[in-house]
């Protein structure tokens, strides 16, 4: 399932083609994905101007000129394909074969861009686990999917001081705390494993046990911010079914230090340990017991 960097990569790929464009019409090829499409989905979007594309945690948000917003989630295998005259100029050249399989094209947005050029934005989802829902004018932040989300782990919003306040008194393992979307929004299994390795912290350690150590909290906050920023710059992890908006595979997976590297040498040159795998709450955790304490 795509994590925050993958969704941000998709947002940035779609942005030049969607922002400022007018929706000419929408082809809706089935009544539902994970959830049913909103009533009159295609009709309500026709003629609307797209003001901005945003992201909250792992959700893509599309803001329209009448105040209506679309909340979209890519699910396990969702992707957007761009068909436009200048689309070939984007990285990847739109050559990913799966994204061109029209059998799973469930929604097609026909757009007229501000420069007069046309574009088609196609949502493809073989597993149909993604979704598109509406948030009415003024109700986006209070939407049930968004209202309880925690702080974003990007920019300067996440600091050691913020982490200390979030972790204080918590007995849950550090990894579980970092995956709690009510505390920090958008972190997933891959990048939590990587951030904990960079910070030198055991994923099994109780979150509250380090809340009072500000140097440790600052180190962890910095590790989270840097791993997310680097993943976004690299185009996301592209594991399994995830692909970018332009159809190209990302390459951050080549930089993984622990994730998926069970039994391989730790990449900390001062360590000499071996990457281990354990299961926490049904998910694989990769870490180095030698340098993560």
Curated annotation (Swiss-Prot):
One of the Pfam families matching this protein, by short name: zf-FPG_IleRS
UniProt superkingdom: Bacteria
SMART domains the record matches: Fapy_DNA_glyco (SM00898), H2TH (SM01232)
UniProtKB keywords: DNA damage, DNA repair, DNA-binding, Glycosidase, Hydrolase, Lyase, Metal-binding, Multifunctional enzyme, Zinc, Zinc-finger
Binding-site positions, DNA: 104, 127, 170
Residues at the catalytic site: 2-3, 58, 283
Zinc finger residue extent: FPG-type: 257-293
Keyword NAD attached: no
InterPro entries the UniProt entry points to: DNA_glyclase/AP_lyase_DNA-bd (IPR015886), DNA_glyclase_Znf_dom_DNA_BS (IPR015887), Formamido-pyr_DNA_Glyclase (IPR020629), FPG_cat (IPR012319), MutM-like_N-ter (IPR035937), Ribosomal_uS13-like_H2TH (IPR010979), Znf_DNA_glyclase/AP_lyase (IPR000214), Znf_FPG/IleRS (IPR010663)
E.C. no: 3.2.2.23, 4.2.99.18
Protein role: Involved in base excision repair of DNA damaged by oxidation or by mutagenic agents. Acts as a DNA glycosylase that recognizes and removes damaged bases. Has a preference for oxidized purines, such as 7,8-dihydro-8-oxoguanine (8-oxoG). Has AP (apurinic/apyrimidinic) lyase activity and introduces nicks in the DNA strand. Cleaves the DNA backbone by beta-delta elimination to generate a single-strand break at the site of the removed base with both 3'- and 5'-phosphates.
Quaternary data: Monomer.
Similarity field: Belongs to the FPG family.
The protein's name: Formamidopyrimidine-DNA glycosylase
Gene name as annotated: mutM
């Amino acid at each position: 399932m795509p994590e925050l960097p993958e969704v941000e990569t998709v947002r940035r790929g779609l942005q030049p083609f969607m922002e400022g464009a007018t929706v000419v019409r929408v082809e809706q090829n089935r009544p539902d994905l994970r959830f049913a499409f909103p009533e009159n989905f295609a009709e309500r979007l026709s003629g609307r101007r797209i003001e901005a594309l945003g992201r909250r945690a792992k959700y893509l948000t599309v803001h329209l000129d009448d105040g209506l917003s679309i909340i979209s989630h890519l699910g396990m295998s969702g992707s957007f394909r761009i068909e436009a005259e200048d689309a070939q100029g984007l990285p990847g050249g739109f050559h990913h074969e799966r994204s061109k399989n029209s059998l799973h094209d469930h929604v097609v947005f026909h757009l007229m861009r501000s420069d007069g050029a046309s574009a088609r934005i196609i949502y493809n989802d073989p597993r149909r686990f993604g979704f598109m829902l509406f948030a009415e004018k003024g109700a986006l932040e209070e939407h049930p999917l968004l209202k309880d989300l925690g702080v974003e782990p990007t920019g300067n919003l996440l600091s050691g001081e913020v982490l200390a306040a979030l972790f204080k008194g918590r007995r849950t393992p550090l990894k579980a705390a970092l995956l709690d979307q009510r505390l920090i929004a958008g972190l997933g299994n891959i990048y939590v494993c990587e951030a904990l390795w960079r910070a030198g912290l055991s994923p099994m350690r109780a979150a509250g046990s380090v809340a009072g150590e500000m140097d440790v909290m600052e180190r962890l906050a910095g590790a989270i911010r840097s791993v997310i920023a680097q993943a976004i710059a690299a185009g996301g992890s592209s594991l399994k079914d995830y692909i970018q908006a332009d159809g190209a595979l990302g390459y951050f997976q080549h930089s993984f230090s622990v994730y998926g590297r069970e039994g391989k040498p730790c990449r900390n040159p001062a360590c000499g340990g071996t990457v281990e795998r354990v299961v926490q709450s049904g998910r694989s955790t990769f870490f180095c017991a030698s340098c993560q304490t």
